[in-house]
Amino acid sequence: MSRVGKTPIVIPAGVEVKLNNQVISIKGKNGELTISVHKAVNINYTGNILTLAARERVSDGWAQAGTARALLNSMVIGVTEGFTKKLSLVGVGYRAAIQGNILKLALGFSHPIDHQLPLGVVAECPTQTEIILKGPDKKLISQVAADIRNYRRPEPYKGKGVRYADESVRLKEAKKK
C-alpha cells in the first residue's frame, strides 16, 4: 500500500477545487490546472481536505493513488505559490533576451535561436546569462527548461552550454600527449 497515497491534501484558503467524476480542477491566484485521475482511484473532497484511496479489486490502485496524490499536491502548490526554474548560460558570447513571449538565445551558432514560450510560462532575464522560468504548472516549467537546455547542453571538457542553476557539470581531463 502506498503511504504517499494515504496522506490527505489540505487545501489552503483561496483555492477552489471542482470535482467532476475523475476530473479535478484546482483554481488559485496563479491560475487553474486540471487533471484526469485514473479510474482505479476514489476521490473524496470534504471541507478543505482532499483524500484519495484505491478502489476495491484493482491491482495497481494504491500505486495510482500515490501518483495522483503527488500530482494534485504539486498542482495545489503551483496555483498558490508557483514554481521557478533557473538556467545559466556559460560560454563566451552566450546571451539570452526576452522579447514579448519569445526567448532569444545566442548560443554560438551562426544564427540566433528564438524559443516560443507556451501559455502559462513567464520568463525573466535578470542578466544576459541567466534565465528564470516561472509558472503554476511544474511539468510544463520543467519541460520548457529541458527544451532550452537541449539547444546547447553543457559539454564535458570546458563546461560551456546551458545548464540548470543547481547543476554541477563533471569536467573530463583533456587528452594528454
Swiss-Prot record:
Signal peptide stretch: none
GO biological process: cytoplasmic translation
Domain of life, source organism: Bacteria
Family stated for the protein in its record: Belongs to the universal ribosomal protein uL6 family.
Upper lineage: Bacteria, Pseudomonadati, Pseudomonadota, Gammaproteobacteria, Enterobacterales
Protein name as annotated: Large ribosomal subunit protein uL6
Alphabetical keyword list: Ribonucleoprotein, Ribosomal protein, RNA-binding, rRNA-binding
Keyword hit for RNA-binding: yes
GO molecular-function terms, A-Z: rRNA binding; structural constituent of ribosome
